[in-house]
Design a protein with these regions (language model features):
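N-terminal active-site beta-alpha-beta segment that forms phosphate/nucleotide-binding
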Residues: 1-118
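Flexible, active-site-proximal loop/turn residues at the rims of small-molecule/cofactor binding pockets
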Residues: 52, 129, 191
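Glycine/threonine-rich flexible loop motifs
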Residues: 58, 132-141
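A short, gly/pro- and small-residue-rich
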Residues: 64-71, 139-151
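Short, surface-exposed, charged loop/turn segments at secondary-structure junctions
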Residues: 93-95, 137-144, 176
Length: 195
C-alpha cells in the first residue's frame, strides 16, 4: 500500500497540473451541482474553506459559491488555524479584510464572531484525494478530523468534500479509526453521496 505522503504528493501534483481555465470551469460546474443537489435550499449555516490566494496548489476555489451563498442570506463560517494546532470556525464576511495564515490561506480576523461546531448544518471540506467509500485524504495536519471528531456524532454536520474529479482515487485510500468519512463529494462531474 502506498503511504499517505506519497499519495498526497501524487494527487497534489495532479490537481496542480490542471490549467487555470480548467480549474475555473470546474469551480463553475461545482457551483451548479451544489445547487442541483438541494444543498443550497436545505442548509442555512455553512462551514466552508478559503483557498490560497495565489492558486498555486490547484485546490477548488469556492469564491463564486461563497458569493452566491452570501447573496442568498446563508451564514458562512471559515476555518482559522490556531497556533496550538486546533481549527475553529469564524464568521465570513466578504466585505471584511482577510489575513493570510502561515500556510498562505486567508482567514477572518480573530475579532470576527466565533462559530461553534454544532451550529453548522453543512461543512464543505477541502481535500487532496477521496475514494468511492468517502475516505478523505487531507493535507496531513489532521485539522478537520480533530475538529469534526470533537463534535458528538449525533450533532455532526453533513460533511461534503469539494474536489476536481482528478482527485478521485481509483483504489481505496488508507483509513484510520480517527478519520472522519465524507457524507458526499461534489466535483465537476456531479454530486456523489456516500451514505
Amino acid at each position: 500500500m502506498t503511504n499517505r505522503s506519497e499519495l498526497r504528493r501524487r494527487f497534489r501534483k495532479l490537481r496542480r497540473a490542471l490549467p487555470p481555465d480548467t480549474r475555473a470551469a470546474n469551480a463553475d460546474s461545482i457551483v451548479r451541482h451544489y445547487f442541483r443537489s438541494g444543498l443550497g435550499l436545505r442548509n442555512k449555516r455553512i462551514g466552508a474553506y478559503l483557498s490560497r490566494r495565489d492558486g498555486q496548489d490547484g485546490e477548488v476555489d469556492l469564491t463564486l459559491l461563497l458569493e452566491r451563498l452570501v447573496s442568498l442570506g446563508k451564514q458562512i463560517a471559515v476555518p482559522v488555524i490556531r497556533r496550538h494546532g486546533s481549527m475553529e470556525f469564524y464568521a465570513y464576511d466578504p466585505d471584511q479584510p482577510l489575513l493570510d495564515n502561515r500556510f498562505n490561506i486567508p482567514e477572518p480576523h480573530l475579532l470576527a464572531r466565533h462559530v461553534t461546531g454544532i451550529s453548522r448544518d453543512l461543512i464543505l471540506a477541502p481535500l487532496v484525494a477521496f475514494d468511492d467509500s468517502g475516505v478523505r485524504l487531507g493535507m496531513g495536519g489532521g485539522y478537520y478530523d480533530r475538529y469534526l471528531g470533537s463534535i458528538c456524532p449525533m450533532l455532526r454536520p453533513l460533511i461534503v468534500g469539494i474536489a476536481h474529479e482528478t482527485q478521485r482515487s481509483p483504489t481505496p485510500l488508507p483509513f484510520d479509526a480517527w478519520d472522519i468519512r465524507l457524507d458526499a463529494v461534489i466535483t465537476e462531474a456531479g454530486w456523489q453521496p456516500f451514505r
